[in-house]
Amino acid sequence: EPLFIGIDKVWSYINQPASNPLLHISEGPYIYDVPSFNEEVIREAILNAVAHRSYQIQSDIVIKQYPDEITISNAGGFPIGVDINNILTVNSIPRSKRLTEILQKTGLVERSGQGVDKMFYYCIMESKPLPDYSKTDAYQVNLTFQAAIQDKAFLFFMKEVQESRAEKLNVFDLLTLDKIRKGINDSLDPNIIEKLRKEQLITVNEGTTYSLADKYKQFIPRKESIKGVTSQQLQKVNECFKTHDSISKSTLMETFNGVLTEKQVRNLISRM
């Protein structure tokens, strides 16, 4: 079938409720439904595979979908001059210039290099692992996308930041924020660091280390706790409820015999 029809059919096959379920996440008033696999990302990856594959090698573009990941592979390694480290910064030379021009003029793909930017951009915005090219070799490009959301707080943080801006942060800004979230402080672009600092998106700590702004920390869920009661004590109370319909002071005294005094048991009851 023609590519224009085939790409829609491939996405329809991938985007089934059972194979591409929505991930429901919430924190306070914030509620988002995030697809396991982002349509923009997957379409761009497939079209990149079509545009950059080697047509001198008789091999199909292979798409494998699993519950937690999708892999897309195409014949031929990276185009000349492109590798894992510079894939976002170098302008690649297409293997088929005419095919690439057709895809660009029909609006199916972005101009050279922009498609990869889009894949990284959406993965970071949804707090998913970055596109993984680690299994690529001289004979094939192998690209993997993971479904799992790594950090819900970061997702909420990025949504709020971008939605409040007239000029959106670009993919390099997002990459820097993502590295700081992971505790990576080496090889960061000083110009981007200064930009993010001025916009109060990061904090500069001692020893040239960085952390995300307090706004990010507000989205980190707080662990529920009862002041003055240890987790071990709560576990013992939970075990009591498994064997008793109700718990009296005497029951707790038996449970904590030799561990807590009567006064401490009364104090425990008052705090629960």
Where are these regions (language model features)?
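C-terminal regulatory or interaction extensions
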Residues: E1-M272
